[in-house]
Amino acid sequence: PSFPRASVDASPMISLKNPDLQAPRQKAIAAMRASLSPEQWERNAQFVAQLRQEIAQHPVSRHPAIARLNSGTVRREAMEQIHLEYRHAIVQSFTDALLAAQMQSRQLEPRLAPGSKMAGRFLLTLNVLDEFGFRPGQDAQGYYLGNPAYAHYPLYEDVLNAYGISNEARVNHRPSAIAREVRAFLEDSYGRYTDVATLLAVAEEEVILFSPPLRKATGALGLEVNDGYYYVHGVSDDDSAEAADDDHEDDLWFILTQALTDADRESLRTLGLRYCDLWVRFWDHQMTLADGATAWAKPGAETASA
């Protein structure tokens, strides 16, 4: 299906002699908005707002695991297991999904005007730069600032190092069925732009929900959480930290707002809520495993194990 879009003939030639490079996120969002008619953008934005509200009210948003982790009474064995499971479910494949979305933005054309895919790719790139370890600014040679060691996935591996989880244990870890299902559900979306954008936005919401409790439970064991992975995840309300999860989530919803057609709505709503359902089962399973191993400490009990 197609819908009215902004004319591509009315814009003057872009000049590079005096480039305007300020506020890149806002410029990308404005360009995405301009690629649709005002009426279509508004309809899409209303749908996205309704879907976000449904997700905010979904049981995953108040899962008991949040309170249990925040209690700081989770034993080390359980936390090691949870981090390995979470690694398989989302950490290892998250940037794969971002790159899949960048590629599949090609599906916007020719339904939208030539070049319309680039604003979305630009916005996704800002997310990817953070994930890959780049930072705003220029180095001493006037080049980009960045270090692959600061990419979020390697930073997560450093958390496993802090827990004392060996490389052999990581390789030999057998993810639970639900961890495999959560991962596969995202990976199966890679072929369709609207699908992967929807699930990435939901995944960011899960990161925002569960990173602070995971950080708190990790810190309660005496592990460092004021640097590394938990310095960029789990501290969205800390101005001194480098978290950008809220911006990333908003960006992905803007991506979806541009990409939507009227015919997509019900299928994407179902897709997003099914992914939330899987995350409920994922956290149910983590708690069940931990309870079965008597790994959730009683209030007041020693939280660090030998």
Tell where the protein language model's regions lie, with residue ranges.
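Acidic, Ala/Val/Gly-enriched low-complexity intrinsically disordered segments
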Residues: A6-A10
